[in-house]
Amino acid sequence: MKDLGERRESGSVYELSAEKRVVSVKFGKRLSVRDVEGYVTALMADPSFIPDFSEIVDLSNVEELDLSSEHAITLADMVDPFCSRAKRAFVAQSRVQIHAARLHQILRNDERNIRIFASLAEAQEWLKE
């Protein structure tokens, strides 16, 4: 696991399994554009990363979302390192978390390959399908 956060409240921790072709990322209590950009920058620099890997985005710790609509559009359109056929599973439980995941799903215009789950186990199971 690569810890990309300076504090527990923000940042992210990601793990890449080239064997399983899955990237898992867990964000802290506060999610900002800087946190997402830091994760993407580290992922793009990782020589094991391939854009068609699957991804699990665990938002279960996020309590505060500090992303404007303009930031969300930029992240979805220009910063997102995954290709359109990659399966993406968001773990979200609260209204704030579900809103963040749903916003990305809408902006990427992909309800087939981007799904939202209440638990990590459900997300992992879907990626195995």
Please place each PLM-identified region on the residue numbering.
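Amphipathic, Lys/Arg-enriched alpha-helical "gate/interface" segment within cytosolic domains
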Residues: 2-129
